[in-house]
Design a protein with these regions (language model features):
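Catalytic Walker B motif of ABC-type/P-loop ATPase nucleotide-binding domains
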Residues: 119-122
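Conserved ABC ATPase signature
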Residues: 94-98, 102-104
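Conserved beta-strand-loop-alpha-helix hinge in the C-terminal portion
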Residues: 173-197
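Helix-to-loop junction immediately C-terminal to a conserved catalytic motif
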Residues: 8
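Short coil-to-helix segment of the ABC ATPase nucleotide-binding domain corresponding to the Q-loop/switch region
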Residues: 54-62
Length: 207
């Protein structure tokens, strides 16, 4: 979460530099920072962060409304995104009327509606049951394969096993990393589990 806060320009690193594209985050002024986050970053949270008094449609469109995007363009972005995420029939409903998995899909749509350079996901499966978790992870796989960069913080081995690269952070440092390679999710799951067991018992090496 600390790493995500730094990447979101909510916190500043004690040393080093953070770049998004060619822009150094610490060089973005306080006046610009809110617009910078809205235009370049998408956020998905464990608890969805949807407004209960807004329909799913209004929740998803909120970042574009705040950016002053014309209504026609908002609708042009919303339709294919809602279709892809399987929530078109739910857009008029309110968050309290849909399931946790459907809320998270709406939250993902809100994060993607601005066409961000980077999607930040903080424990996105933490509040979901097994079925909804599987659905969200498949969704993330599809989004990633379409060219969207996703950085996910998770304590779930299952969620991590869907990634292309896993970083293990210990005491604030990158302690080890794994790349998926050509193996299956199950193969990668086992490699992640084995690495965690080594780290928990004091083994492993920095990489």
């Amino acid at each position: 979460t600390t790493l995500l806060n730094i990447l979101a320009a909510l916190d500043k690193p004690t040393e080093g530099h953070v770049f998004l594209g060619n822009r150094e985050l610490s060089a973005v002024s306080e006046k610009e920072i809110s617009a910078f986050r809205r235009d370049h970053l998408g956020f998905v949270f464990q608890d969805f962060n949807l407004l209960d008094t807004f329909s799913l449609r209004d929740n998803i469109l909120l970042p574009l409304v705040l950016a002053g995007t014309p209504y026609r363009e908002m609708e042009q972005r919303l339709k294919p995104l809602a279709d892809k995420l399987g929530i078109t029939s739910l857009l008029s409903k309110f968050p309290y009327e849909v399931s946790g998995g459907q809320k998270q899909r709406a939250a993902v749509a809100r994060a993607l509606i601005t066409e961000p350079q980077l999607l930040l996901a903080d424990e996105p499966t933490g509040a979901l049951d097994s079925k909804a978790t599987d659905g969200l992870l498949r969704l993330f796989n599809g989004i990633n394969e379409s060219g969207q960069t996703i950085l996910m913080v998770t304590h779930s081995v299952k969620a991590a096993s869907h990634a292309g690269r896993v970083l293990f952070i210990k005491d604030g440092e990158v302690f080890h990393q794994l790349y998926r390679g050509e193996g299956t999710d199950q193969d990668f799951y086992q490699r992640i589990t084995d690495t965690l067991n080594l780290l928990m018992t004091g083994g492993g090496s920095r990489a």
